[in-house]
Amino acid sequence: MISSNDFRPGVTIELDGSVWRVVEFLHVKPGKGSAFVRTKLKNVQNGNVVERTFRAGETVPQATLDKRAMQHTYKDSDQFVFMDMETYEETNLSSEQIGERVKYLNEGMEVNVIMWGEQVIEVELPNSVVLEVIETDPGVKGDTATGGSKPATVETGAQIMVPLFISKGERIKIDTRNDSYLGRE
């Protein structure tokens, strides 16, 4: 159990049979009446965001999440197969369970799978990945690093904006948190 006074961004709680992550909180002490905590909560299973108010000191169950290191081994039709790095058990996940980060998932990549009981809540990719550019407009003599950017498609099918000097076949480092180009590899 966790007190509403201990809420911080990132804390996970259980409400109404779901897991919620505290996005924002505000402790309010009105001049008259008792204090309360106004929160913005995000459902980690479906992404819904709600605002909810708790009395100061009210206790709610804290969600116990388990982080497991897994490796993406292969893709089987619309299922992605992951192997637990400790037990070597295989787990199948759909692209809906992985979310929008599926565009950076490459075979052999190690990820953290966040579980609530036996239910997969989230797949955490590394902060950056190195992928090969398979399609982009050719670079033209005179293009500079400060010039601008152009779209490029990487080996997983994701499209990101890269500097004009990047050409097909180069390996680039990409930030998976904000889809940005970090540099050549």
UniProtKB/Swiss-Prot annotation:
Pathway membership, UniProt: Protein biosynthesis; polypeptide chain elongation
InterPro entries given in the database record: Elong-fact-P_C (IPR015365), NA-bd_OB-fold (IPR012340), Rib_uL2_dom2 (IPR014722), Transl_elong_fac_P/YeiP (IPR020599), Transl_elong_KOW-like (IPR013185), Transl_elong_P/YeiP_cen (IPR001059), Transl_elong_P/YeiP_CS (IPR013852), Transl_elongation_fac_P (IPR011768)
Cell compartment(s), UniProt: Cytoplasm
Keywords in alphabetical order: Cytoplasm, Elongation factor, Protein biosynthesis
Domain of life: Bacteria
PROSITE patterns reported in the protein's UniProt record: EFP
Major localisation: cytoplasm
GO CC annotations on file: cytoplasm
GO MF annotation terms: translation elongation factor activity
GO biological process terms held by the UniProt record: peptide biosynthetic process
Family: Belongs to the elongation factor P family.
Function of the molecule: Involved in peptide bond synthesis. Stimulates efficient translation and peptide-bond synthesis on native or reconstituted 70S ribosomes in vitro. Probably functions indirectly by altering the affinity of the ribosome for aminoacyl-tRNA, thus increasing their reactivity as acceptors for peptidyl transferase.
Protein name, UniProt field: Elongation factor P
Name of the gene: efp
